[in-house]
Swiss-Prot record:
<dbReference type="Pfam" id="PF01791">
    <property type="entry name" value="DeoC"/>
</dbReference>
<feature type="active site" description="Proton donor/acceptor">
    <location>
        <position position="89"/>
    </location>
</feature>
<keyword id="KW-0963">Cytoplasm</keyword>
<protein>
    <recommendedName>
        <fullName>Deoxyribose-phosphate aldolase</fullName>
        <ecNumber>4.1.2.4</ecNumber>
    </recommendedName>
</protein>
<comment type="function">
    <text>Catalyzes a reversible aldol reaction between acetaldehyde and D-glyceraldehyde 3-phosphate to generate 2-deoxy-D-ribose 5-phosphate.</text>
</comment>
<dbReference type="InterPro" id="IPR002915">
    <property type="entry name" value="DeoC/FbaB/LacD_aldolase"/>
</dbReference>
<dbReference type="InterPro" id="IPR028581">
    <property type="entry name" value="DeoC_typeI"/>
</dbReference>
<dbReference type="GO" id="GO:0005737">
    <property type="term" value="C:cytoplasm"/>
</dbReference>
<keyword id="KW-0456">Lyase</keyword>
<feature type="active site" description="Proton donor/acceptor">
    <location>
        <position position="181"/>
    </location>
</feature>
<keyword id="KW-0704">Schiff base</keyword>
<dbReference type="GO" id="GO:0006018">
    <property type="term" value="P:2-deoxyribose 1-phosphate catabolic process"/>
</dbReference>
<dbReference type="GO" id="GO:0009264">
    <property type="term" value="P:deoxyribonucleotide catabolic process"/>
</dbReference>
<dbReference type="GO" id="GO:0016052">
    <property type="term" value="P:carbohydrate catabolic process"/>
</dbReference>
<feature type="active site" description="Schiff-base intermediate with acetaldehyde">
    <location>
        <position position="152"/>
    </location>
</feature>
<comment type="pathway">
    <text>Carbohydrate degradation; 2-deoxy-D-ribose 1-phosphate degradation; D-glyceraldehyde 3-phosphate and acetaldehyde from 2-deoxy-alpha-D-ribose 1-phosphate: step 2/2.</text>
</comment>
<dbReference type="InterPro" id="IPR013785">
    <property type="entry name" value="Aldolase_TIM"/>
</dbReference>
Amino acid sequence: MEIQKFIDHTILKPEATEEQVKKLCKEARDYKFASVCVNPYYTSLVSKELQGTDVKTCVVIGFPLGANTKEVKAFETKQAIENGAKEVDMVINIGALKDKKYDVVKEDIEAVVNEAKGKALVKVIIETCLLTDEEKVKACEISKEVGADFVKTSTGFSTGGAKKEDVKLMRETVGENIGVKASGGIRDYKTSLEMIEAGANRIGASAGIKIVEESK
């Protein structure tokens, strides 16, 4: 298995410097990862660094709380795409989901999906550690309904990360036609493999190199 093709090589910590981001891009080029995932500020830099390679620029939207308005998320998406993003990882409105305001959740995801249509893949972060199983299923169903390309477990900034049980539930909910991304706390090959076996076809991790080296 070419594990590197599953990996979104990620640096989302607020103190990330330009030098660190450039280093990450070089690693992604060398290891042929799926993408480099960064905060919006670094979109242009990453796009420039990855030019002429198959590694995609992936940018987070409404991150990490998901509590921005849909208009702001749509604008963030538009700007990210203009600056070279080929994938966007958005955080849902978690409070609205808890309140069973499913129309709000739907419109929120839809705002990003509509902005990205035909230009970038959309991954929807549902933040599994804050949800009941019922809420996880609902978030996945809504994401699928509005045309998201992936559902994703976690931001890595909340109370917990990816669990294989959640990945399995998400995969069962969305079926085979959309992606499932496991992220948050995945630091070795063994865990990555467990996530893939549970149904993930993308892994978000800052430990991508370690994961690949362990797979050899």
